[in-house]
UniProtKB/Swiss-Prot annotation:
Positions of transmembrane segments: none
UniProt lineage: Eukaryota, Fungi, Dikarya, Ascomycota, Taphrinomycotina
InterPro entries recorded: Metal_Hydrolase, Metallo-hydrolase/TatD-type, TatD-like
Organism: Schizosaccharomyces pombe (strain 972 / ATCC 24843) (Fission yeast)
Gene Ontology terms for molecular function: hydrolase activity, acting on ester bonds
UniProt cross-references to Gene3D superfamilies, sorted A to Z: Metal-dependent hydrolases
Gene designation per UniProt: scn1
Function, as annotated: Interacts with cut9.
Protein family: Belongs to the metallo-dependent hydrolases superfamily.
This protein's GO CC annotations: cytosol; nucleus
Protein name listed in UniProt: Cut9-interacting protein scn1
Length: 335
């Protein structure tokens, strides 16, 4: 599977297995950042295995509460900031003991500046894992700086969607600025995800197919050059769990960003409509992923994902390898 790219994985969560990365059968891994404390681990892995690891930097919606809006006048005082921040973004409002156990929040601007530095240093880097997650509830500690998996039982407290959107859109804006691909997590809120993303291209010049046919290639490229600065070029909806109808919405001609859809066995096999959804994805927009935290499991999980794609699309396994490899290269602009 040398030509296959694992479109979404988290091997930095299992540092004891990172030595296995070099000998994986998959050709490359897109390794996700999820929270302020793990961006450095993603960077370290990319430095150690530059030919194998494509880094992706971002704040997952599960960790969006780590960031506070430093433009909010109510959060200027360091003495009251933590309490006010969590009271603003969590619902219902937690008690003081719960808030005290939470990490001290980081300014959004500080994270974005750090991500900007990473993007400059790694021209192939993505933004991710970012997104929106409606049913997510905060865990009841302890808070493990190394793991992206919830530790302990879940609390009754949710991160308000308003705050999730603020953190998400700030990162999409950064992806647009640097023209980088994005890996997106979305659970039970695809309509809100679409409306959040549509802000970036609404009102922009998007020529009709007839207009495109009449334009010379150079004229078309020049006309779009300025418009492209306002939205990311490509977005992967990872472990996609939306409907086939929503695929049509994201992939409509009026949407200038190219949408890809990746699938993992661990997540997508839970859904009874998994095979039907796979059938509904355009053949050239399908990607494979493990979405796993252990390097030792990545090859097998990617292989299982490819097997299910073969079944759903009625492709041979060899044809599936060829098609998914081509799609991965197109997503990353790899030639």
């Amino acid at each position: 599977m040398e030509s296959i790219i694992d479109a979404h994985c988290h091997p930095t969560d299992a540092p004891q297995e990172l030595h296995l990365v070099a000998n994986l059968s998959v050709g490359k891994l897109i390794v996700m950042g999820t929270r302020p404390t793990d961006q450095k681990y993603v960077e370290q892995l990319a430095k150690e295995y530059p030919g194998k690891v494509i880094p992706s930097f971002g704040i997952h919606p599960w960790f969006s509460y780590y960031l506070y809006d430093d433009l909010d006048k109510d959060l200027q005082s360091s003495e009251t900031r933590k309490k006010k921040h969590y009271e603003k973004i969590l619902t219902p409002i937690p008690d003081e003991d719960f808030i005290n156990a939470l990490p001290n929040p980081v300014p959004i601007s500080e994270f974005l500046e750090d991500a900007r530095r990473h993007l400059k240093q790694y021209p192939n880097a993505l933004i991710g894992e970012i997104g929106l997650d409606k049913p997510f509830r905060l865990p009841v500690g302890p808070y493990d700086a190394r793991s992206s998996l919830p530790q302990g039982p879940l609390s009754p407290f949710y991160v308000k969607m308003e705050h999730q959107c603020k953190v998400f859109e700030a990162q999409v804006r950064l992806a647009a600025e640097f023209q980088r691909a994005v890996s997106v997590h979305c659970v039970q809120t695809y309509a809100l995800l679409y409306s959040s993303l549509a802000k970036f291209w609404d009102g922009r010049w998007i020529p009709s197919k007839t207009k495109i046919r009449k334009m010379k290639k150079e004229e078309y490229e020049n006309s779009l050059a300025e418009e492209r600065k306002h939205y990311p070029p490509k977005i992967c909806l990872h472990s996609y769990s939306g409907s086939i109808e929503q695929i049509s919405q994201f992939s409509a001609h009026k949407v200038p960003t190219e949408f890809y859809y990746s699938f993992s066995i661990g997540i997508n096999s839970r859904y009874k409509n998994f095979i039907q959804t796979l059938k509904g994805v355009p053949d050239d927009k399908l990607l494979a992923e493990s979405d796993h935290h252990s390097a030792s499991q990545i090859d097998e999980l990617v292989r299982q994902s490819l097997n299910v794609m073969s079944e759903a699309k009625s492709w041979t396994f060899e044809d599936t390898i060829t098609k998914i490899s081509s799609n991965s290269k197109a997503f990353l602009k790899v030639t």
